[in-house]
């Protein structure tokens, strides 16, 4: 498998990216919203296999204090190949020099991210657009 990596936004098919998140499965993400999010991200990577988008990730970063890795996804056909690990490693490498690198991930993947040195934070809090849904999905709790 020969993969092509890029951080360029110029040839991204935002509908294809939306379909990747749906298939991963990481939910429904609007193509226009994805374009805004990735365009606003300091670091990003898109991975192609034979012109098909198979993996993606991004990080919001300020260049000094904090880099925030999020929206990492791999197409099911390429899950288990080490691609997700490579995407995270690439974003961590790009984020080097920041005082902290924060990661947002789906529940149940903590062991995977510990391999990169990530530790669970005890001080993080969030306000979601739909607090009840976030609670239902286990993303937040009352404590």
Regions found by a protein language model. Give the residues of each.
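Conserved acetyl-CoA pyrophosphate-binding loop and the N-cap/start of the following alpha-helix
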Residues: 47, 78-87
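Conserved active-site alpha-helix within GNAT-family acetyltransferase domains
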Residues: 97-102, 106-130
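A conserved beta-strand-loop-helix scaffold within acyl/acetyltransferase catalytic domains
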Residues: 33-73
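Short amphipathic alpha-helix that is part of the acyltransferase structural core
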Residues: 1-32, 124, 137-143
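Short glycine/proline-centered loop/turn elements that form peptide/ligand docking sites
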Residues: 88, 131
